[in-house]
Amino acid sequence: MIINSRLMFRLKYLNILGSKAELAALPEGKLLINTINAHSYNTARKDELFAEALTNGDVLIPDGVSIVKACRWIKAKRLPKERIAGWDLFEFEMNKLEECGMKNVECGVNGEECGMNNSSLDNSRSASADNSCSGKRLYEPSAKLKTQNSKLRSSQRTVMFMGSSEKVLDLIVKRAAEVYPHLKVVTYSPPYKPEFSDEDNKAIIDAINAVNPDLLWIGMTAPKQEKWTYSHWNELNIHCHVGTIGAVFDFFAGTVERAPIWWQRHGLEWLYRLLKEPKRMWRRYIIGNTLFLWNMVKEKC
């Protein structure tokens, strides 16, 4: 179903993923995976293109306890069983690709298909970084990469991070090298501006297509990242899962602290962020959560 107006955007009609088990069962190939929470719902009610992007992507993940509870209360089309945070998506996909990279190295076969299992959801392995690209050009592989064993190099799987700043991407590369040693990490930092020019868009698309990654993360904050990916989806000649997870870039890089486990388990991650950054977050969570509740009352009726 194609949404042509933000006025048609309703939580009760969205095809939201139900569980982590469903996440593990997603098919391989080119898939656009977005997340939805109370804030993105409110934004989509005012932004037609964002509403289209969330509705017409391949997978929509409930990144918020409020979404899970609201779906049950309004008796939505899909009733998700649990929250799946953007971080959960990130860890699952990265662990899966890392496992595949390990198997390829063990077998010494380039491009061998790997079987995955649900245990990847609970593993905490992470990824490596061997080359990066930023701005408008792809950088050449480092000397260290060039001298690696050819079998290992050819069997590596590639993950690409598109978005954020050079500083954050450098931190991502360093951490990935420690926790995902069987993956090759490529990064691209787009220009920092509200709207990209045609030249900017072409440079980004060309960079992604040149890398042709096995996994692509887009991190430009919502709704920009979802709208950009949706608008240029047909121009991306790639074969992999694509996730729009802006905040996760900062979490993984360590530039933003994620809420402790207790807060996460009790669905209070939003409150932790509000207490940490009240000046920046009060409007989003105090006014935004109230607006979300009011919209749910209207959907219920």
Residue ranges and their predicted role:
Residues 205-222, 229:
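Proline-aspartate-enriched helix->loop->beta-strand connector
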Residues 1-91:
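N-terminal nucleotide/polyanion-binding subdomain common to many enzyme families
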Residues 74-98, 156-207, 211:
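Conserved beta-alpha
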Residues 1-2, 97-126, 131-136, 140-156, ...:
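Short, basic, low-complexity termini and linkers enriched in Ser/Thr/Gly/Pro
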Residues 69-72, 258-301:
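A transmembrane-helix-recognition feature enriched in membrane-embedded lipid enzymes
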Residues 190-196, 238-276:
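Short, flexible loop segments at boundaries between secondary-structure elements
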Residues 30, 157, 237-241:
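A short helix->loop->beta-strand "cap" motif at the edges of active sites that frequently abuts
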Residues 38-41, 220-225, 248:
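Short glycine-rich anion-binding loops that position phosphate/pyrophosphate groups of nucleotides
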